[in-house]
Amino acid sequence: MSTVDPALLGAYQTAEYVVLDDPPIVFQIGVEHQGLSLLLLSFGAESACFLTAWNPRSEVLSADENLDRQMRLLALIETERLNYFVGRGESSDGTWAEDSYLIFDLDRKTAMQWARTFEQNAWVWVPGVGPAELVITEY
């Protein structure tokens, strides 16, 4: 099991997760968002995950390093032929933001594997109906 700093967990819990649609969909952990549910429904998706490749284990990397990692994640998404939206996770106090993807119908087990591959502390599970859930990455 992974141990994540409690302050980081708090930041993840209160962050805003933004799906860059028109208009953008902004959701939070533990709060059901009708627009997000409708987006999944419109793609025939049963679930989604919100995942980034930025800043492994919260180690701040350069913009170029983060872009390279994010492109590798995108290559995995496209190889699996999954529908996705570009997104962004943003702290509630505005001190950090990370580019992300909302990935449709990636099963939970594979999402966990991808989170491990990109050394993420946590990621977000989005059920078709119900609130988004913060998932701590298991190492």
Where in the sequence are the language-model features?
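N-terminal, charge-rich interaction modules
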Residues: 1-75
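Mature, function-bearing regions of proteins
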Residues: 28-33, 74-78, 87, 91, ...
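Ordered hydrophobic segments in well-structured contexts
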Residues: 48-52, 85-86, 100-104, 122-125, ...
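Generic structural motif
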Residues: 54-56, 106, 139
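Residue-level marker of positions within ordered structural domains that often coincide
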Residues: 56, 78, 116
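Short, surface-exposed beta-strand/loop "edge" segments at domain boundaries and coil↔beta transitions
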Residues: 57-62, 109-112, 133
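Amphipathic protein-protein interaction modules
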Residues: 67-110
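Short, compact, well-ordered microdomains
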Residues: 96-131
